[in-house]
């Protein structure tokens, strides 16, 4: 099982820091992930709200690529219903070229109401738009002839293709269990955020089994899960930061997540999430040992959310390096 880092470039909760400082934090996170031997750094795309300060992951991924040599770099996710897929294909092909073929391409359909409202996209159409845009995106990255949706558009081929052929590894993130068969049928890898969707690792294991059972014969796809991780001497400090993060998230996230919390408040309680096993806070050795449980249930990659709730960048980077060392030992 691989260990990676994942950031939403969180700007909440207050006191707010300058956006440029948060971008510098992400570059420092990339440095720490590379030094700590982690597999990848993944960055989320968000718009119009302080819970996510990266509206353009290709820009930030390219900056991280300039500072690293081995670390894979991923977006999780590119929100396909909001974008013109041919333009996305051009941007991510460039990132893959600039990084020497290190791009992981995670895609999703979006879930935050404000983002749909800001782009003028009807959430009822997101599944259909996702399917259509993904088909065009993959065809464009593969060098096939594609056509934009505007009536006056002519067929074109990209003049810059990714290093990885036919395209970078594709991951699809889902929040609802009923979407898992859709990912499996496509043969894509699956990304999950279990603290927001399931109650315990046993439920997560059931989702992973369901995914693998529905993959087409002969297809090898992977499962990644996002967990809040802190490896250091101040787990109490990290626990307080996690609760701040959860409080801010509840105010900005999807109706689905808010309804989930109403039915089961543990999804927004730091201690409950820690007790469920989806937040691992402790010494580097303790966290590394507890991570192995996820390998046993079929997880291929843990996406560690290290920079939550306003934790100092120095604390975050030390945690990443220490856990990376413990995981490899």
Language-model segments: residues:
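Internal, glycine-rich beta/alpha segment that forms the wall or movable "lid"
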Residues: 84-188, 202-209, 213, 217-219
